[in-house]
Amino acid sequence: YLYSRQMVLVRADSDIATLADLAGKRVAVQATSKPETVFLERPEPERVPKVGEVYCFSSMEEVYSAIRKDFVDAIAGHEGAMRTFMEDSPGSWRILDQSLLVSGLGVAFPKGTNEILSAQLTAVLQEMQKDGTTKAIVEKYGFDPDQFFLGRGGSS
């Protein structure tokens, strides 16, 4: 139904402008997160360079502290978490245009169960997209609808 994006955040005055610019840099992530996997296992080495150090913390608060105190050059996490963090200090931070990772989201039920509920949920979500409700919700929370909906972008 929707896309979920993992993004990279840097200081507003950072010289890091693209994922390629992360080569050799220090990056903080939350342990066991998708960004941790991307930086440590590098499933797409042509898109995501080898960084200098990956610091894995148990909470996003620790990740935020690492960049606030200049211990790292960048942090990575879910777009919503990055945007919420930015609200505390407008103008101090920016999110890179390139997504670190884009995942399609949906709702799943065990096979052979909840067919009626599944059909009802699908119908309601489709109606919400048609009448603009979903777009309004996405915009209310500071996201770009063109990057959020399956079939409408989200590939950056």
Positions of PLM-derived features:
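Beta->alpha turn/N-cap motifs
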Residues: 12, 30-33, 59-60, 76-83, ...
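Short helix-initiation/N-cap motifs at beta->coil->alpha
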Residues: 14-15, 54-65, 103
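Ligand-binding cleft/hinge of the Venus flytrap
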Residues: 35-57, 86-90
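Extracytoplasmic
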Residues: 3-5, 22-24, 34, 69, ...
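Extended ligand-binding regions for polar small-molecule ligands
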Residues: 20, 25-26, 31-34, 107-145
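Immediate post-signal peptide segment of exported/extracytoplasmic ligand-binding proteins
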Residues: 15-26, 152-156
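A ligand-binding cleft/hinge motif common to bilobed small-molecule-binding domains
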Residues: 38-41, 66-101
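Periplasmic-binding protein-like
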Residues: 2-10, 87-125, 144-156
